[in-house]
Curated annotation (Swiss-Prot):
InterPro entries: Zinc_finger (IPR050331), Znf_C2H2_type (IPR013087). Gene3D superfamilies: Classic Zinc Finger. SMART domains: ZnF_C2H2 (SM00355). It comes from the Eukaryota. This is Suppressor of presenilin protein 3. Probable transcriptional regulator, which participates in the transcriptional repression of the presenilin protein hop-1. GO terms for biological process: positive regulation of transcription by RNA polymerase II. The keyword RNA-binding does not apply. It comes from Caenorhabditis elegans. Residues 671-684 have a biased composition (Basic residues). Keywords: DNA-binding, Metal-binding, Nucleus, Repeat, Repressor, Transcription, Transcription regulation, Zinc, Zinc-finger.
């Protein structure tokens, strides 16, 4: 311990926590008298004012330091004397001034009218356009350029015994590894660093700057980039680290009283020699069972060490945040012993830097989303929403009077009529309409007569008029329909559509931002994020209710005998009672009206029918069957459409479910064979 510090410790032990020298103005205690004397200047009204700028201080050494740093050209040589002012002046305490020996022919400097701080010295990188205000940051940046000399090609990936071919790993003795080694720059590390070290010596104050430059040292370098530096205090000292056998395994770099140890074969940096020595052993000790780095001679039998080493060959980041992250990574590598076994569960980063756990969770989410449990029977809602449009001109519109029927685009091919059919019209599905010219028996077997498919003979000049019935429109909000029907069931039919239709207010952001305070002094506005969330929710509800179609609902139990098939199809969709009755008939028959599917199991049949009403991302090319599972749609197209055609031609049942109805003869019970009796053992 230094003597001054030891004496201070003795004073602290003698005087206790508080010193014996106490200031009578503020009560602060000091262990020494010099500390109290320096402290009393803070209470004195003495100030040192700079004549050339607005700088003011209370200590002489601070004033002299300011003159040397801020006004070096104005300071003249001369003895330092103590000048006393007259008693008439206000200053009661002496002021220190510098008396200059000025000759007659000396030029007097006038005070500066406007003072400006000198521009800070900028440190420019000789290898790129980066500029730094700190010398230490510039040194680290130049050191980061050396990893680019070892940057491996992007085509070569990491190493793994099990996934060597998938990730592109290479053995040390493989032909691809030898070929890449021969094509790689085979210069030594010292030769590769010649350009970098020469620029560091020129710009950061090495002794090599005074020596003449030799073109043979580095013929490929150029001096087009120069840095403006002015360093007097800090410098960089390098020293080679040599083994007993004469092999150079690294360099010691000293900067700002901090030692750094650099490996001569890779970008490894350490703060102690022992870590560098343990690291360099992986460069010289090789075996056939070891894995090697594709950018240097580093090898190890542990794949985890190889993966950690490959990360150091990546290009150095340039921003301050990533630079600090790199420093923490280097310190963590040096702190941990490389020979210490690491966690085997830790997996290396993939070639594209993706996280495997995130990919697994995403895959599980997608599989869960695609394979969600199907409900046995869904509630049948309104038909598929389409924009209201006039009926397609499939026939002459003057022949029919559709009455109050509102038409919309029908997705079901059963509701489409062929233009060329002027004879009695039949509405088969798309698959059977193609085979009309082949065989009449196939049409008779495949097409089923239903309520929506009847033969209607069209005669020109005859008009089909719907009976006059009162109508009402469904409100835009379906939730309000139940309460109105229960209380005013008779009055709804007499009201008009304009009176019954509710007016929906368009949501505005200002309505949710401003609120009525509970108390007078409470806040009158919500948080913008909360207001935006409420506005978006109201907007979605508005769009959902506003786009709900106003479909007419007719009275029930009305029979329309002479009704056009197109109008009847529209009427059946809008009349929910008849729609449910038709669906019940379809379920009783166990035969799908949109495709040739048949199944005796009601649960399986309902699951199939739901695919026709609830759309998916994949659609069958033969009908409106859709699902989010592509394989399910392909199986439906092949089994229900293509195989059913083959069964019809060959005279086989059109569905596998019909095979289940064939009684299976009971198996005749077989008699159990008697086990043979074991004979008695003979005596020995």
């Amino acid at each position: 311990m230094p003597p001054r510090k030891r004496k201070l410790e003795e004073l602290k032990n003698e005087q206790g926590e508080q010193g014996s020298y106490k200031c009578h103005l503020c009560g602060q205690c000091f262990y020494r008298g010099c500390g109290l004397a320096s402290h009393l200047r803070r209470h004195a009204p003495v100030t040192f004012d700079c004549e050339h700028c607005a700088y003011t201080c209370k200590h002489k050494y601070a004033y002299d330091r300011h003159l040397l740093q801020s006004h070096p050209e104005l300071v003249e040589s001369g003895p330092l004397v103590r000048m006393f002012k007259n008693e008439d002046e206000d200053a009661p305490m002496p002021i220190l001034e510098r008396e200059a020996d000025v000759s007659d022919d000396a030029v007097k400097y006038e005070a500066l009218s406007s003072f400006s701080e000198p521009e800070p010295i900028s440190y420019k990188c000789p290898l790129c356009i980066s500029t730094f205000g700190s010398h230490a940051r510039a040194v680290y940046h130049i050191l980061s350029h050396r990893v680019k000399l070892y940057q491996a090609p992007k085509s070569l990936k990491f190493f793994s015994r099990k996934t060597m071919q998938a990730l592109g790993g290479f053995r040390l003795e493989s032909q691809l590894m030898i070929k890449w080694r021969l094509q790689y720059d085979n210069r030594s590390v010292d030769e590769k660093r010649t350009r970098l070290w020469r620029y560091m010596e020129e710009n950061f104050g090495h002794e090599h700057l005074k020596q003449p430059k030799l073109e043979s040292d580095n013929p490929s370098t150029s001096s087009s980039f120069e840095s403006q530096t002015n360093l007097n205090d800090s410098s960089i000292i390098k020293k080679k680290l040599v083994m007993k056998c004469g092999t150079v395994f690294g360099q010691r770099l000293i900067h700002d009283n901090t030692q750094y140890y650099l490996c001569r074969n890779c970008p490894y940096v350490s703060w102690n020699v022992s870590s560098l020595w343990r690291h360099f052993r992986h460069h010289i000790q090789k075996s056939k069972q070891s894995w090697t780095c594709i950018a240097c001679s580093y090898s190890s039998s542990s794949r985890v060490k190889i993966d950690l080493h490959v990360k150091m060959h990546k290009e150095m980041p340039e921003i301050d945040l990533e630079f600090a992250t790199w420093l923490r990574y280097e310190r963590r590598i040096n702190k941990n012993d490389l020979n210490k076994p690491t966690n085997k569960k830790k997996k290396p980063d993939g070639g594209n830097g993706s996280n495997h756990s995130d990919m697994r969770s995403l895959h599980a989410f997608l599989s869960l989303k695609n394979s969600k449990n199907n409900v046995v029977k869904h509630d049948i809602d309104a038909p598929t929403l389409h924009p209201l449009s006039p009926a397609p001109k499939l026939v002459a519109m003057t022949q029919f009077d559709f009455g109050e029927i509102v038409t919309y685009k029908s997705v079901n091919p059963l509701h489409q009529i062929n233009k060329n059919n002027s004879n009695p019209t039949v509405l088969p599905n798309k698959r059977n309409s193609i085979k009309t010219s082949k065989s009449d028996t196939q049409i008779a077997l495949s097409v089923k007569q239903s309520s929506s498919m009847k033969m209607v003979k069209v005669s020109p000049g005859k008009v089909y008029q719907l009976p006059k019935t009162s109508k009402f429109y469904r409100p835009e909000s379906p939730d309000s329909l139940a309460s109105n029907n229960s209380a005013h069931g008779d009055e709804i039919e007499s009201t008009s559509s304009d009176q019954f239709q509710q007016s929906v207010k368009v949501p505005k952001y200002e309505d949710f931002l401003n609120m009525k305070p509970v108390m007078p002094y409470f806040q009158k506005q919500r948080h913008p994020l909360e207001a935006i969330a409420m506005y978006e929710k109201a907007k979605r509800e508005y769009e959902k209710n506003h786009c709900f179609p106003n479909l007419p609902i007719f009275e029930f139990n009305i029979e329309y005998k002479n009704l056009h098939p197109l109008a009847k199809a529209q009427y059946g969709k809008n009349n929910m009672k008849e729609y449910f009755l038709n669906e019940m008939e379809v379920e009783k028959s166990r035969e799908c009206t949109d495709c040739p599917f048949k199944h005796n199991d009601l649960q399986q049949f309902r699951l199939h029918r739901d695919k026709h009403f609830y759309g998916g991302s994949h659609t069958c090319p033969e009908c409106n069957y859709s699902s989010n599972n592509h394989n399910q749609v392909v199986e439906h197209t092949f089994v229900d459409h293509y195989l059913s055609d083959v069964r019809l031609v060959e005279g086989l049942p059109s569905s596998d479910s019909e095979d289940d109805n064939i009684p299976v003869p009971p198996d005749t019970p077989q008699r159990k064979k008697k086990a043979p009796k074991r004979g008695k053992r003979r005596g020995w």
